[in-house]
């Protein structure tokens, strides 16, 4: 949940008695923060420390910090953290050591602030000039995406940060941003298996403890037989992710505040 969802404030930048009472009433498992919640380093540390102290069971405190265009923390110069470039640039280097260093920078910065969950890395395979995922992806080679996303998982873990692969079962061929409306991917399951699913399958198999997988809002009618969004589809979540890929850890949806 967002802090606003349980406290009913417009923008949560402090955690005090209102947050304490909210967590007593709504014992959430985790809270996700956005740029609007994070004003500067000192404020963010206090916000997260206080929030965590009010929870009877330790919370996941998460943020979208991919590097590049999706950097809720790194995009704010007042946070005093190193800026990490986009994943496409890392993909072009084809250097696992560079990817590991980027993950260390991100993970170390988040851990120092009090976060313990990063909704990253992006495991999507960019396909075509119109791909919405763009520079957020490591590139168009499924094996490269699998390798470098797996490296980020390891480096985040080394810094005490839980990772989340996204956006299952693959956002790379989408040409409409699902923040702006319904997006349909016409691929069949065999086509997904030959490209989009490769990074997810590889990382889940080799990194059995990858803690989270985020499922997208995209529709895959040639897989599910309907326009049901992936994160509401038993065919996607249960049949493919749980059963076929044997993923047994936490599955989370993309934000339901999107269009």
Task: Give residue ranges: language-model regions.
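Conserved beta-strand positions in the central sheet of alpha/beta enzyme cores
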Residues: 32, 118-119, 164, 214
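Second-shell residues forming the walls of enzyme active-site clefts
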Residues: 7-11, 15, 39-55, 59, ...
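Acidic helix-start/capping segments at beta-turn-to-alpha-helix junctions
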Residues: 60, 65-70, 123-129
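A short aromatic-anchored loop/beta-hairpin motif
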Residues: 21-35, 221-222
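Short, acidic/polar
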Residues: 6-24, 98-109, 194-200
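Short acidic/polar active-site loop segments enriched in Thr and Asp
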Residues: 29, 116, 211
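Active-site-adjacent structural elements in enzyme catalytic domains
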Residues: 38-60, 67, 94-114
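A substrate-binding/cap region within the structured catalytic cores of diverse enzymes
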Residues: 85-115, 120-153, 157
């Amino acid at each position: 949940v967002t802090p606003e969802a349980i406290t009913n404030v417009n923008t949560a930048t402090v955690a005090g008695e209102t947050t304490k009472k909210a967590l007593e009433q709504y014992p959430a498992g985790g809270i996700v923060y956005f740029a609007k919640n994070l004003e500067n380093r000192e404020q963010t540390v206090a916000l997260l420390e206080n929030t965590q102290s009010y929870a009877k069971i330790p919370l996941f405190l998460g943020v979208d910090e991919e590097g590049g265009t999706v950097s809720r923390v790194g995009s704010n110069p007042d946070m005093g953290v190193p800026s990490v470039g986009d994943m496409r640039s890392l993909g072009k280097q084809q250097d696992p050591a560079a990817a590991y260093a980027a993950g260390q920078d991100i993970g170390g910065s988040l851990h120092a602030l009090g976060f313990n969950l990063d909704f990253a890395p992006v495991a999507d395979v960019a396909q075509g000039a119109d791909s919405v995922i763009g520079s957020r992806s490591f590139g168009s080679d499924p094996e490269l995406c699998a390798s470098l996303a797996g490296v980020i998982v390891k480096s985040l873990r080394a810094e005490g940060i839980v990772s989340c692969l996204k956006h299952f079962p693959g956002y790379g061929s989408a040409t409409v941003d699902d923040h702006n409306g319904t997006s349909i991917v016409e691929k069949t399951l065999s086509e997904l298996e030959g490209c989009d699913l490769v990074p997810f399958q590889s990382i889940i198999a080799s990194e059995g403890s990858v803690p989270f997988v985020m499922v997208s809002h995209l529709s895959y009618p040639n897989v599910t037989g309907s326009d049901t969004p992936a994160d509401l589809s038993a065919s996607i979540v249960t049949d493919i992710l749980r059963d076929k890929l044997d993923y047994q850890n936490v599955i989370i949806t993309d934000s339901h505040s999107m269009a």
